[in-house]
Amino acid sequence: MLTTSTRQKTCDLATLAIDLIDQAGCEYGDIRFCTYRNQTLHAHDHSLSHLTDHQKSGFGVRVLLKGAWGFAASYRQTPEELIRMVNLAIEIAKGSRLCQQNPVRLVPVKAYQDTYITPIKIDPFSIPISEKANLLLTINDRLLQYQEQGIRKANSYLQFNQENKLFASTEGSLIEQTIYRSYSGYRCTAVANGDAQSRSYERPPLNLGYEHIDQTDLLSQIERVAEEALEKVYAPKGPSGIQSTLILKPTNLYLTIHESVGHPTELDRVYGYESNFAGTSFATTDQLGTLQYAAPWINFKCDRTQPAGRSTIGYDDEGVPSQEWYVVKEGILVDYLTDRETAYRLGKSSSKGCAFADSWSSLPMVRIPNLGLEPGPIGGSHTATLAEMIADTKEGILIDGIGSFSIDQQRRNFQFGGDGFWQIKNGKIVGMLKDVTYHAMTTDFWNQVDAIGPASEWQQCGTNMCGKGEPLQIAQMTHACVPVRVQNINIGG
């Protein structure tokens, strides 16, 4: 939250920018003043190996002139520099017109004057560095108590972010937001018989304060994590070249959702804006409303209002309020992730509010919001608890956590690993496996889900390292979901 004097100064600069943009005859313009504070701690074995605590500030000006975008940014927040950046953005827009194929048009948005602050109980930056470092070293010390049994490495981390943003537009919006983010976890590695295997645990990346760093929970999982790493290093390798039933915990499934549902439904990607870098999408607009993306009992919902969600905000970087909507409803592709530009091109009347820029020096683009798998309804014919899925499986594999992954340029054909694997036989877990991967075609995979967990097993998992764009931008989002069971999935090579 900006101080009163700083806010007034920033508002005065914003007013100056908007006046200049209007005077230049632009169809649209906006300005973002941003301050980011990032604090990261890493501990390796018995020492603190990495500590950063830095802050950066600046502003970015975006103009739309005769259907072409122009953008300029600077860290110097003075009237003189602001005037220079507005003029530069206008000149860039004029240059952009020279290679423009079709003019950019935007769907309308109301003007908002509002303030949004992430609800937190404890400011993470109010906690002394020493206390945070001691927590990490305590975790590592306890993991390394299993050194005689074979634990050789311990790593732990804490990460905190605070983002202050003031947005103003030629449409009359003036929005101030303060976002807090917290994240923690650890990993240990066991070594035996010429092999090394790891297990990990995390408090997932969420928009919360230091209250999210539940020390009791973090410390209570240490024994289990260490023992599973030791069991895993001695475990047999997983099967290869077969088909199997998979039961995926939310800690594994969220990444599959991210890669095979999130990215394919980014409308800028569908339209080819990413084709020279990350690729395109199989989920083309001619299939909207007809593509059988998943089984009829599968619903994928976006929700930027989700409490504590990593992508939860008040407004996106175009001043569009947060909202919720389905991208897949009863298995059918029904919508996309849009900003104001792509929504207009699709013929929609409004944006879904997915515009995000990771810095004052970055252009907003369509990013995945909080996007999750809805739980199965109570009493539903395909609803089952994790325990019921296991008990009802004659032979299969249970997967927890994330590992290696790959997916093709159209998000059609993928391969995923995991962090923990257990063999299931006759409805019981009989032991761990290691080095398991599964691969499938996206729509085949989601149509072969025959059981989904209830709301009581819904879990918020997600990522804080989603890369997109050139230059590369990093975004974060939550993929809350429940366990699922999937039939006839290819395992290994």
Regions found by a protein language model. Give the residues of each.
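Active-site bordering "gate/hinge" segments
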Residues: 1-324, 329-332, 426-428, 442, ...
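Dual-mode signal for accessory low-complexity, basic/Gly-rich regions
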Residues: 239, 275-493
